[in-house]
Amino acid sequence: MSENCNSRHFSWLMKSCLPNPSDAKSLVQIHQPSSTAANSSATIASLPDDLLLECISRVPSSSIPSLAVVCRRWSRLLHSPYFLHLRRRLGLLRHSLFAISTVDSGLFAADLQFQSEIASWKVSLAVSSRSVGVDGSYGSLSHARAAAIGPRVYVVSRNAVLRYDSWMGTLNLRSPMIFPRKKFAIAVVSGKIYVAGGGGGSEVAAAVEEYDPELNRWEVVTQSARKRYGCIGAAVDGVFYVIGGLKIGNETSRAVAARAYASSMDLFDVESRQWLRSRSVPGGGCVVAACAAVGYVYVLTSHAVELSFWRFDARRRGGNSGFGEWQRLKSPPLPAQVRLDGTVRFSCVGVEDKVAVVQVVGCIDDLLRRSGRGERGIRESLVLLYDTTEGEWRRAADLPEMITRAACACVEW
């Protein structure tokens, strides 16, 4: 790939960006310099980065992979945060629920778009593990967490980080976390990834790491007051929420503390690098899934005989006086008196004004059978959607069969 562009590479772009010379209405009389020896292609090639971005940010998503191979300069601009910002400002981005999983044979990923009347999963990735080097020395991607920054999904596991670009359809290995950990909280704040908690020792659980995708570098930014294992992450208005999980360490009264941790969340203000006052879900229970959507943190909790669904007002900006308030919402349409025992697990993802609850592990029919109940019809890979505007649940298309133990995220592309 050359560093600069030539006329052959972007002649198609000129046809869409320049006015039709045969259309008199599209022509505007402008001042012409005295020396016009350079042709139009040279003029396009000499555009500064900001003006060139204004042009290429308007192309259809399907054309973006072609733009990336024009030259190194264009590829660099396509990967810049400003390109994503321009497309967002122009209303050219769409949101999808993204699920990725690893099995012995390879990696599989699929996305679900809610904009169409009949939403169905589209398998967007199916590759061998060896082809991307996630086996052997790079460790395993099992039990990974996923976080998306625009169109790029970062699959973060104990020993490896894999980046999938939904625009380009490419996979790349990135720098792993400083402290190998599993079952940790993860979220994105201002274009950077934050992780906290997880198994791997007391020192590991206390360290909060920040990942800069531009520099491909991790660093420890603070220490957690509470060391959590099996926690969940979310982010709203510059705050990283570390939710649920169990207490780890050698402190006394561990059983009591674990129950308290399971229904509480710690709040880390990324800009000030300060911890805010911790909050707890009313009524206790054990948080089994959580996510952020439209300014709120949504939490699914498991109790002795039921599931409950809550939202926490996380809007701190704009003079909102309701910050910190909890509200109980309509529970998901699952069999009554279901108590999750760890064999069935859910992932919660905010997608625009909807909350997707995805069954990523286990079979509810088996759970009911073990409790002596005979209901059937809810097996595995269940996907439920909660409309935050209407306050109602509906069932979406189940996960594809090859997507098991998935890591889920909302992709903007």
UniProtKB/Swiss-Prot annotation:
SMART domains: FBOX, Kelch. Disulfide bonds: none annotated. Residues 41-90 form the F-box domain. SUPFAM superfamilies: F-box domain, Kelch motif. Kelch repeats lie at residues 96-141, 152-191, 192-238, 240-295, 367-413. Keywords: Kelch repeat, Repeat. InterPro entries: F-box-like_dom_sf (IPR036047), F-box_dom (IPR001810), Kelch-typ_b-propeller (IPR015915), Kelch_1 (IPR006652). Pfam families: F-box, Kelch_1. The keyword Repeat applies. This is F-box/kelch-repeat protein At5g26960. The lineage of its organism: Eukaryota, Viridiplantae, Streptophyta, Embryophyta, Tracheophyta.
